[in-house]
Amino acid sequence: MFRLSSGLLKGGACASRSRIPQLGRSLYSTATSAGADKTQGKIHTVIGAVVDVQFNHGRLPPILNALETTNQGKKLVLEVAQHLGEHTVRCIAMDGTEGLVRGTAVADTGNPIMVPVGPATLGRIMNVTGDPIDERGPIEGVRLMPIHTEPPAYTEQSTHAEILVTGIKVVDLLAPYARGGKIGLFGGAGVGKTVFIQELINNIAKAHGGYSVFTGVGERTREGNDLYHEMQETGVIKLDGDSKVALVFGQMNEPPGARARVALTGLTIAEYFRDEGQDVLLFIDNIFRFTQAGSEVSALLGRIPSAVGYQPTLAVDMGAMQERITTTTKGSITSVQAVYVPADDLTDPAPATTFIHLDATTELSRGISELGIYPAVDPLGSKSRLMDPRIVGEEHYDTAMRVQRTLQEYKSLQDIIAILAGVA
């Protein structure tokens, strides 16, 4: 029986190796010398998801390094977030800390969180640390990559514009998607963002020649379960054959540290396939939960919040991830990101910060969904940088402009009718 919230399985991918400056873009070998020493420490304080670790001997582990300890017989990964004085680091736990006690031994891995990448991840479900949670045993024959890396150099990036056909007419006509671009699905609660992504998976991923990575960030376990079984039924995932999709989940009940990092785990897997010359589809549902988890972590670390309670590093955190989602001369990553809009307010800092990184935006309207029209795409609110006659062609561009003009006139007449009805 498939359970997203099952515990970490033994034999999950983790390896210690020497730290490489700047982390670079190269693929790393998992080999490590048998006698390599790990910096040892012990747990000093546990306050929810925040764990302080004391190192009385040796140097402190760098920021973003992964530390490992055991909690009730299971591996627990901690990520270094702050240095407190000369001997203590403050960490964020990637799993629950219930049962963790002071004095427990902690080892510095010498690396950021390392996750498995490569063909062996296809058809499997992993958590933020790359451990399988589909109860199908360990993921073997893989190499490991750090979830924190630098984006590709400008000279490696490609600017070629090509349309990605989705099969959804309102999108393909009025706000077409770019192959290798970043696409945002904006909408409030219950307007159909997840269903829209599932439709895109059905239309694109099944006919897509490359691989897909689906990352569930802070969403419902039930939706992940339904998606997994639906992919099995449609043949995207084959338990006894070649699958075309890898799934990474950090669901709603996970600690904020896991929800803040799980998107990077999925992105790291997608980057590997891209650098191997593949065209990759990366689905992230929901990017708002990434921001929300970041604000929780920021509050736990004692940082003063900025507007509406978000972390002061909101723009930096979002930019660091979005800049890695790009197309290079080797391959492409086409990213489709669902963006929850709190209270249907598009000026909220979280969706507003996401806007600036996107090539196309599809706005899902509550008013249209209330009419029973699905997908509830707002044809006037959705935009794309590809809507240019030099890219889509003169005929396509003129048709789209006429459609939008007609819809805008209809909307204006609706307002006039409402005013006259009120006067009468």
Swiss-Prot record:
Q: Where is the transit peptide?
A: 1-60
Cite the InterPro entries for this sequence.
AAA+_ATPase, ATP_synth_F1_bsu, ATPase_a/bsu_AS, ATPase_alpha/beta_chains, ATPase_F1/V1/A1_a/bsu_N, ATPase_F1/V1/A1_a/bsu_N_sf, ATPase_F1/V1/A1_a/bsu_nucl-bd, ATPase_F1/V1_b/a_C
| Enzymatic reactions | ATP + H2O + 4 H(+)(in) = ADP + phosphate + 5 H(+)(out)
Major place of residence: mitochondrion
**Key word Nucleotide-binding present in the record?**
yes
Q: Give its localization.
A: Mitochondrion; Mitochondrion inner membrane
Which EC main class describes this enzyme? translocase
**UniProt entry tagged with the keyword RNA-binding:** no
EC assignment: 7.1.2.2
Q: Which residues bind ATP?
A: G187, G188, A189, G190, V191, G192, K193, T194, V195, E219, R220, Y374
MF GO annotations: ATP binding; ATP hydrolysis activity; proton-transporting ATP synthase activity, rotational mechanism
List keywords of the entry alphabetically.
ATP synthesis, ATP-binding, CF(1), Hydrogen ion transport, Ion transport, Membrane, Mitochondrion, Mitochondrion inner membrane, Nucleotide-binding, Transit peptide, Translocase, Transport
Disulphide bonds annotated for this chain are none
Which GO BP terms, alphabetically?
proton motive force-driven mitochondrial ATP synthesis
Report the sequence similarity comment from the record.
Answer: Belongs to the ATPase alpha/beta chains family.
Q: How does it assemble?
A: F-type ATPases have 2 components, CF(1) - the catalytic core - and CF(0) - the membrane proton channel. CF(1) has five subunits: alpha(3), beta(3), gamma(1), delta(1), epsilon(1). CF(0) has three main subunits: a, b and c.
Q: What is this protein called?
A: ATP synthase subunit beta, mitochondrial
